Amino acid sequence: MNILRKILIVFVIGFVALLVAAQIASYFFLKPILEREGRHLLRVPVYIEKAGLNFFGGSLWMKGVRVKNSPGFQERDILSARTVAIDLNLLSLLTHEFTVRRILFKDPQLALEINEQGEFNGAAFFNRILTQSRKWVQGERRFVQLVTHYILEKFAVRNGAVQFVDRRNSDRNLSVRFISFSLARVVYPPDPEEALPTAVYLNATVSGDSEGKILVLGRINPFASEKSFDITGSVKGLSFAQYQAFMSPSPLPITEGTLQLKIKALCHDNQVDIHHQVRLERLRFSPGELPEAQVPLVFGMKPEAIVRFFNERGAPANAFEFDFRVLGDLDDPNFNLLSVANENLQRAIHEQLTVQMKAVEEKAAQVVG
């Protein structure tokens, strides 16, 4: 018994010493290993200031992460982050589960760019990630089959920023700052007893002449065969004029106005119900330059009538409000969510314009009378 006890003690001490040695070695060898693997995955240089590994806690951290942009683009880095941390639950592997406690990005910066040739750096970047991920799954098929359950307890982005630059048209440049994003409890394969297992949260500020606020929160089931979600979203103070370059050409370009939007999106077993509440403030249009005979109807009305209503009759001082719903079955091959939403939006604007224009005309007639 004493011999077995001594052997056990020696084994434990040796195992702990091995972990400590590996812990110390990680500070010297982990950084170049991660840079090499990152370069292999993304096909561009990857730089890391510091990296560390905690064998006892099952955690990996990196500081000063930079992913170089592809050749042909002016932005230096496509992605950078002050800190990236990954925490694993290694004991979960004993039950054929692979649990990631947390993936955290602090101060990440994503620089999306369209160069003068019309090439988009984001397309190549994300395609490389998907391609290499598929190769890894195929190469590690034994490990993938051994694990029967995957759980991501939390994915979080703190104080993130996304910058979009179009070298062909500077009016399309866009910046989104102060991004807070999180996913909680992502499970694969999905548990049939959990209708909406994953919580979603997004809060961001859109920079520009006037700052807009975006908020999204709710719950989803991303891997279920039949879509289910319960999402609430809002947009406040988004400037129309600032994003005119992103909109389709119109005979009535918007020169002023802000958008306030609330959305409640529900879906259960592919039955979708999305309710929109829209409030447009200080809306003004610029008359198109096309001859009158060539100007198409806008929202089913003559463009000059809309310009007169918003620009000349004091309508911009008041909010223009309307709401519309999108109902449908995602299993129906004839149902197109975007087409139905656009059709219902056009109808709602036309109906509200008709009501408000009629009210203005009646008020003007009473004044004259």
Describe the predicted segments one by one.
Residues M1-R43:
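N-terminal type II signal-anchor transmembrane helix
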Residues A195-A199:
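Extracytoplasmic/periplasmic C-terminal soluble domains
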Residues L202-G208:
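Low-complexity, intrinsically disordered
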Residues G38, A51-N54, A81-F98, L110-I114, ...:
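Extended lipid/amphipathic-ligand handling interfaces
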Residues V44, G64-P189, R282-R308, G328-R347, ...:
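Secondary-structure transition motifs
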Residues V44-K68:
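Short extracytoplasmic
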Residues V44, S210-G212:
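Short acidic/polar mixed-charge low-complexity motifs
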Residues M1-F11, T148, N221-F223, K264-N270, ...:
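Extended terminal
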